[in-house]
Design a protein with these regions (language model features):
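A structured binding-face within diverse protein domains that lines the active/interaction site
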Residues: 1-161
Length: 161
């Protein structure tokens, strides 16, 4: 199962057809990144300074419910488009979500937006580190199973926790 589509591969790979007609937006308040600290992975929550919603560029594939049999390889779902890292906390790893401005998100969703225009939007979207802040959060976000989805997971914790 894939959860992201690399921007540098999205326009020339399996994702190309979805880049043409399967664009979607994944709304978010922020995202997590894990940093190695004291021999363990410490999660950080990254969010915009102005607390405005984020618009992650996404690609979606949804089978046609009216089709007698869905095309081979069709899987319902979506992936987040990721971009190359440029350094700093937003880029702890080599990839990060492709965050679009509200205007870029609107154009991304517009069915009239061509493949070339969508490519231009994706290649020119920029996430500026100074527009975000980040803080340590509880390692409980790493746990799977029941009870792993709680608003407190997005609250800052102290350095000694």
């Amino acid at each position: 199962m894939m959860i992201n589509a690399r921007l540098d591969k999205a326009q020339t790979s399996t994702w190309k057809a979805l880049f043409r007609s399967g664009r979607c937006i994944v709304p978010a308040d922020g995202w997590y990144e894990w940093v190695a600290e004291r021999g363990r992975k410490q999660p950080y929550y990254i969010q915009p300074n102005d607390a405005a919603p984020l618009f992650f560029a996404g690609l979606s594939s949804v089978a046609d419910d009216h089709a007698a049999e869905p095309p081979a390889g069709t899987v319902d779902g979506f992936v987040i488009v990721t971009d190359a890292a440029a350094g700093g906390m937003l880029d702890v790893h080599d990839r990060r979500p492709l965050v679009l401005s509200p205007q870029e998100a609107q154009a991304w969703l517009d069915p009239a937006t061509t493949f070339d225009e969508a490519t231009h939007i994706a290649n020119n979207a920029r996430t500026r580190p100074e527009d975000f802040h980040w803080f340590r959060v509880t390692p409980q976000v790493n746990r799977s199973g029941a009870g792993n989805d709680d608003a407190s997971f997005n609250q800052p914790i102290g350095d000694d926790e």
